[in-house]
Amino acid sequence: MTQRKGIILAGGSGTRLYPITKGVSKQLLPVYDKPMIYYPLSVLMLAGIRDILIINTPHEQALFQSLLGDGAQWGVNIQYAVQPSPDGLAQAYLIGRDFVGGKPSCLVLGDNIFHGHGLTDTLRRADAREQGATVFGYWVNDPERYGVAEFDQHGKVIDIAEKPEKPRSNYAVTGLYFYDGKASDYAAALKPSPRGELEITDLNRCYLDAGDLHLEPLGRGYAWLDTGTHQSLHEAANFIETIQMRQGLQVCCPEEIAFGQGWIDAEQLERLAAPLLKNDYGKYLTALAKRGAVH
């Protein structure tokens, strides 16, 4: 099992999704048949990460705790911390400094969805890299809208640029980051950007300047979905529905991942399914317990 810690940043005000998010965190909204938070949580679990910190807003923490508990039902350990105000993605490493404790970590944004057949292997490659940082690049047609990474044939990042007018790469940097134990120290030394935030790009640039920033490309066959707008939330739900209906297999199901990882057994899986048997999700878990995991 990896010693890497996991952080899900699920704070923010979700203003782009108003009025839907005026009364509830966007990470608790449904993406087809599961809460949005299940998707980044599943990425950490696929990477073998079992110690997880969820950072959210003060008035929503009880809702996350009610939904996820301490994670024991999935064989993981979930803790919680508050982001008092949305002061940048890199702030996660100040809030989570004691939790990380100088160990390697993975940060995933709470509104990002990743899916693809080789994702687990890609995550394991990043986890095996003990020194430096790894970002994940996704080919896009409009790189000028994103933070973009230029990298060599060995995956070493040469340059990163935020929404460049003339992009030198089509690979956008996604909301998934693997760091070694220096991330909190680097974050503590950052200065707020002109918009008053501790930028994740500046944290990544610390590793770039040290010659320790790597990129794992997510090429053909991968999906990276940002659910931060009404349209993208709708598209993500349609995508998940299509995949699941075609194959009859769940996408980003924590119970299934825990079962496949050997963190829970068939009996525990059936107990998790019991309260859900009135819907297809519960029936899926029951069938999974009987047939075994599908790889």
Swiss-Prot record:
GO terms for molecular function: glucose-1-phosphate thymidylyltransferase activity; metal ion binding. Its cofactor is Mg(2+). Coiled coil: none annotated. Keywords: Lipopolysaccharide biosynthesis, Magnesium, Metal-binding, Nucleotidyltransferase, Transferase. Binds 1 Mg(2+) ion per subunit. GO terms for biological process: dTDP-rhamnose biosynthetic process; O antigen biosynthetic process. Homotetramer. Belongs to the glucose-1-phosphate thymidylyltransferase family. Catalyzes the formation of dTDP-glucose, from dTTP and glucose 1-phosphate, as well as its pyrophosphorolysis. This is Glucose-1-phosphate thymidylyltransferase. It comes from Xanthomonas campestris pv. campestris (strain ATCC 33913 / DSM 3586 / NCPPB 528 / LMG 568 / P 25).
